[in-house]
Amino acid sequence: MSFKKTIGLASALMLAGAGLAACGGDDAADGDNKRLVLYSSMTENDLDVLSGLLEDEFPGIKLEIVNGSAGELTARIQSEAGNPQGDMMWGGLDISTGDAYSDIFEHWLSEHEDTVYEEYKSPNGFFNVDHLSTVAFAVNTDLEEELGLDIQGYEDLLDPKLKGKITMADPTSSSSAWNNISNIMAVYGYGSDEAYDYIDSLLANDLVIASSSSIPFIGVADGEYVVGLTYEDGIASLLKSGADNVRLVYPEEGTSASAFATAVIKGGPNSDLAKDVISYIMSPEGQVAFAEEVGTVRMTTTEPYDSEFLPASDEVKWVDRDVDWLTENHDDVIDKWTELYTAHH
């Protein structure tokens, strides 16, 4: 019997419940060995998929999930460093953060590191890079048609008809929003006036800053927004679930992807189980199992997966992403974003 409870950062970890009670026959030590506290910024759908896969792979696992933005979660891990409460983090760990979290994660890589695409191997010895997140727009086709628009790229988002109808998460705390800002830099020029002028114009068109990374695609599907600046994984999950009022748009000016990772929290109460789980996530079997459930490609070179919900890579216009520049200039870009955002609010 497994136990899963997803809670927000404002809640205390609930380490007892019906699922644990149902496992009362286990002794305390065995129960502790099967309990995994996962900090994650992934979507509810992603977490549901992972939970199901782990229940099959690790019978009896007791999974506690603390869900929040990447910034919130890493701050929490740092604040708990003297008495770690979590075992691992999954999602939100963008490789462009470099060694910023070296002190809170155990320097450990799974045995499957050699199956990861060469350009996405761990940059720091503690990020196990398990998935790519490619920048894309979620577009509500019904609302797009009502407005008489054909949204294909960044410049289309500046149309006055879209004023207040575009959403993106907060790049000061959300890794998916930072991913989108990074792509704007890649398209318009890293640190260039043109890039910041575009961001300024987007804010002037009343860009709505969402409270979570899932709103820019779920809110579009629900008809709250016409466009969400988001990532292909979230949109693909909608398409796989049968959404027929959403289309996935890669900006015609070009798109790029950020690689995201999972890591073992240093000194966590059950780091051995965390390592076993990460090894499964990174394994060819785990990668393909997850890809088949969510409809997106993953990171393994051993068993490539072609998604029916995504175009072939050669059908997408790609731009180069300068990870080193983004790592070195992250704080400056966020400071400039904050300055521009404040000027419009």
Kindly label every feature range from the protein language model.
Residues 40-48, 71, 84-224:
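Extracytoplasmic ligand-binding site segments that recognize negatively charged/polar headgroups
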Residues 133, 198-202, 209-210, 242-266:
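Periplasmic-binding protein-like
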Residues 255-256, 260, 265-321:
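Mature extracytoplasmic/periplasmic domains
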Residues 18-22:
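C-terminal motif of bacterial Sec signal peptides marking the signal peptidase cleavage site
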Residues 24, 30-98:
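Early extracytoplasmic/lumenal segment of secretory-pathway proteins
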Residues 95-100, 221, 225-245, 294:
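A ligand-binding cleft/hinge motif common to bilobed small-molecule-binding domains
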Residues 308-345:
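Extracellular/periplasmic bilobal clamshell ligand-binding domains
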Residues 106-112, 126-128, 155, 244-256, ...:
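Short beta-strand->loop
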